[in-house]
Amino acid sequence: MARACLQAVKYLMFAFNLLFWLGGCGVLGVGIWLAATQGSFATLSSSFPSLSAANLLIITGAFVMAIGFVGCLGAIKENKCLLLTFFLLLLLVFLLEATIAILFFAYTDKIDRYAQQDLKKGLHLYGTQGNVGLTNAWSIIQTDFRCCGVSNYTDWFEVYNATRVPDSCCLEFSESCGLHAPGTWWKAPCYETVKVWLQENLLAVGIFGLCTALVQILGLTFAMTMYCQVVKADTYCA
């Protein structure tokens, strides 16, 4: 009976981790594709220039693949050490995510202030050599969200030391339109505009977060159940 339970949990655990591993492959693939084809689209942050979407996806995908591989191998080999390693790695990720979420909600105001300050510092790198990614990122955001600057279009005045903005701030794009009168520019601040957009899509973000947590809890349950079954089987055989 113990052996039958072990086999059932074993194949469930393997199937779960195979999907987990394939998901990691997908995330890694998207990250590599972004790095190869959209490498010029990088971070908006001046403090964390390597914190681009491509780099985050590559790191996340590789880590998920590694965890999934350990889980698959542990399930097939019925290895207690690998199963426990998988459990601890997944638990560490789960606790890290929970800690980040708690800190984010606890220090929302401070994070808001720091983010705006950092983004304003990043504006001074706009259009400079070696910062094509940041330049393109700002151009895309201002065009798509119909906004200008971090907290106001006047943020750009400090960058240019003149009454002008990038052409991506213009209501109707044309060459050097950023030199025209303020009435021809978007007035909405980009930080608040993007923040409102995220709040409007909070339900989708919440559902994604909940699904991620449930998948991780399921993985933890499978790992610990199989670990216990392997221990029981070893005890029974002994």
Curated annotation (Swiss-Prot):
Keywords: Cell membrane, Glycoprotein, Membrane, Transmembrane, Transmembrane helix. It comes from the Eukaryota. Changing I67M: In a breast cancer sample; somatic mutation. The keyword Transmembrane applies. Residues 1-13, 77-85, 223-238 are cytoplasmic. GO terms for biological process: protein-containing complex assembly. PROSITE patterns: TM4_1. This is Tetraspanin-4. It comes from Homo sapiens (Human). The gene is TSPAN4.
